[in-house]
Amino acid sequence: MGNGMTKVLPGLYLGNFIDAKDPDQLGRNKITHIVSIHESPQPLLQDITYLRISVSDTPEVPIKKHFKECVHFIHSCRLNGGNCLVHCFAGISRSTTVVIAYVMTVTGLGWQEVLEAIKASRPIANPNPGFRQQLEEFGWANSQKLRRQLEERFGEIPFRDEEDLRALLPLCRRCRQGPGTSAPSATTASSAASEGTLQRLVPRSPRESHRPLPLLARVKQTFFCLPRCLSRKGGK
């Protein structure tokens, strides 16, 4: 179920339901606010401020309608010096989707770039195909509209989040590409072919976007970057 919650930005963490009730992790990371987004979210600790969103991890669920509420909650927490944990059951799909929507709003980055940066420190992050489609629909225009609403309510955004996220992008790209060589190795070529196969399995049309990705393909897609990321980190 992972190795604990992941720090995405100052004041913003991503994790699973185990992390959300682990007093050691919560205390160590000074978590003050929690967004619980799964089928039956419940407040567990009296000294934590909760936002509970009931959402199942299925592609057809309209998770996008919760973006505004979650973004305002997370942003208010960070501005007031708190630390917010966003979690679902496994810390893979629902919570990642909400975190991506927030980061898009405060940085102007596209969802693919944000996901790539998150994967640099949390390789299992992997929104389901329907949630990816909703992030695509959320896009730059809607995220910047929400940003203007944040600034009207809270004032100018003081964080340097875009710089922090962009610094992570080269790391995950190098992890996927392997050691810098002009010609791909057999292993890299095989991995690329596998990734291409997985990409073809992801629904492309609006109708198909509601069809769940086969479980095996989702597992392979989720852990595609993990060995290289861990190998690179271990080599430092």
Swiss-Prot record:
Domain Tyrosine-protein phosphatase: 4-144
Alphabetized UniProt keyword annotations: Cell membrane, Hydrolase, Lipoprotein, Membrane, Myristate, Protein phosphatase
Function: May play a role in the regulation of oligodendrocyte differentiation. May play a role in the regulation of myelin formation. Involved in the regulation of Erk1/2 phosphorylation in Schwann cells; the signaling may be linked to the regulation of myelination. May dephosphorylate MAPK13, ATF2, ERBB3, PDGFRB and SNX6.
Subcellular localization(s) per the UniProt record: Cell membrane
Lipidation (N-myristoyl glycine): 2
Entry's Gene Ontology cellular component terms: cytosol; plasma membrane
Region (Disordered): 178-213
Protein name: Dual specificity protein phosphatase 15
